[in-house]
Amino acid sequence: MIVIGRSIVHPYITNEYEPFANEKQQILSIMAGNQEIYSFRTSGELSFDLNLRVNIITSALELFQSGFQFRTFQQSFCNPQYWKRTSLGGFELLPNIPPSIAIQDIFKNGKLYGTECATAMIIIFYKALLALYEEETFNRLFANLLLYTWDYDQDLKLITKTGGDLVPGDLVYFKNPQVNPATIEWQGENTIYLGNFFFYGHGVGVKTKEEIIYALNERRVPYAFISAFLTDTITRIDSRLMSYHASPSTPQTSIGFIPIRDDAIVATVGNTTTVY
């Protein structure tokens, strides 16, 4: 269900020729048909969320095709022109290097980088926002970047919730409870849901849910009897908050609305939204 202000609406793309129109319409249809409530104050916030999701998907595919390597933190490496490898295996931005340039280098020179899947997901999020922000804004918000597991800049606002419906552009986690300790890095896989039943995970590539579960099961202890599984934990960029920094020149998606109800009372507690 999609709510704009106090109106429950069924949105649709009005310009079929705009970039990724079909993908955006699919996302809107999924959100409108889900039981989960997606609440926005304005149509502009919905447009930002839609474009952010598309850019998360395209950034995930770009990273997959970049040559970016899968390595444990003990074996991680990065381009020393822009980053310093920390003692824990993270990537610390060098002084006087614009974050926008350093993030783009990961996608241009992926073979010069290697790390685990959680860090890859954060890199994808930064790249998606860079597509929607002026470089000056991005560099101001995300100065002194450190890329290491789930450590991320405090100005990157994320929402993690348990339960809810899967939408393309969501970050979801596959858990492998009986992983072989010799390959502990396969205890789970952070992935971006690409839509059409496919996920991207750094290390497994672009695969279906069943294929990712199979890959994780192959890395369990001998005689394991518990299968890997897709958890119900979903992580998203808080698009309502992050839309404040969007570039005025960012093209807005043309969205029309079929009104369903215009007197909804919306209440949000934590990350749960209810409509009365």
Swiss-Prot record:
Which pairs of positions does the record mark as disulfide bonds?
none
Question: Any one Gene Ontology biological process term?
Answer: sporulation resulting in formation of a cellular spore
Q: Which UniProt keywords apply?
A: Acyltransferase, Sporulation, Transferase
Any single Pfam family the record assigns to this protein: TGL
Which EC number(s) does UniProt give? 2.3.2.13
* Keyword Nucleus recorded: no
* InterPro entries according to UniProt: Gln_gamma-glutamylTfrase_bac
- Name the family the entry cites: Belongs to the bacillus TGase family.
What protein name is recorded for this chain? Protein-glutamine gamma-glutamyltransferase
Identify the gene encoding this protein: tgl
